Amino acid sequence: MDFDLTATQQAVADVVTSVLDRDLTWQALVDGGVTALPVPERLGGDGVGLPEVATVLTEAGRHGAVTPALATLGLGVVALVDLASEEQQDRFLAGLVKGAKGGVLTAALNEPGAALPDRPATTFVNGRLSGTKIGVAYAEQADWMIVTADSAVVVVSPKADGVRMVRTPTSNGSDEYTVTFNDVAVADSDVLAGGAAHRVNQLALAAVGAYADGLVAGALRLTADYVANRKQFGKPLSTFQTVAAQLAEVYIASRTIDLAAKSVVWRLSEGRDADDDLDVLGYWIASQAAPVMQTCHHLHGGMGMDITYPMHRYYSTIKDLTRLLGGPSHRLDLVGAQCSSN
């Protein structure tokens, strides 16, 4: 496996970097054409695939950008391109084409006590959707929500009758909601034929992995630059053995997450079995990303406690992603289940 960026991925990375180096906002990504990259060419997009979307998310994470990029591109567009018919894509992706105002998509996947469940408690019976989803990013702003249910994957408007939203707190301050569906009517044309919660969860975890990869790499770069320039006793902090050793631990975790994230994306894009790699990726993010962020904070000293300093965005977002994945104990249970089944 060669995990070097392809020419297309490098071009995508260059575009995202050029945008985010100037402005970290969602509108900047929209104006820069980034949101249209995975939209099919017939709709005015560039038609790039999962590896390129992962590149977008990694670069967004590397810059510490807190935007609807993960929800829209990673949880929304990727699943629709994979599962929706052309007619459905034409409707649901209309807000992301070049020249549009910048639509937002999201996915309602998690449930109370269940992170990315392959067998959701949310029910879909006779065209009616009922259940509760938690941790739904940007639900109120979204044009459409992809919802996993016990027997189908459906697309619902947040404004549909029977949809109730309550905003819930996040570490990084981004918008997140608990969404309750009370006998919501869903047309046959809004059901993703052949869609299954397991597939949607696979794609979602791959997207989260790409974003987390960038977040840890960005925090590592920020910290390495800080200790190289911050002097103590007349010497850069980076020359102290303990500092160098701690930074090396962050580097090891960063490289491992990068390897796992890219392996998952490669396997999914090639149609290979990715379940084992996905479980390893989920566990490594949930168990290692937050601790190495703590190390980065520690190496920044008092500067790391300033919420206006970029380090705060990296750490707080990783905390939210860890919660989305269900935490380290849950992810370790999934790894153990894979080992026992094999």
Please annotate each region the language model reported.
Residues 1-61, 99, 202-342:
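Alpha-helical interface subdomain recognition
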Residues 50-54, 73, 89:
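Amphipathic alpha-helical segments in well-structured domains
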Residues 60, 65, 74-76, 97:
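Anion-binding (especially nucleotide phosphate/pyrophosphate-binding) glycine-rich loop
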Residues 66-67, 234:
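Extracytoplasmic/periplasmic mature domains of Sec-exported, cell-envelope-associated bacterial proteins
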Residues 67-86:
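N-terminal glycine-rich flavin-associated loop
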Residues 77-78, 106-107, 283:
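Structured catalytic cores of enzymes that bind and process phosphorylated ligands/cofactors
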Residues 94-221:
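FAD-binding core of flavoproteins
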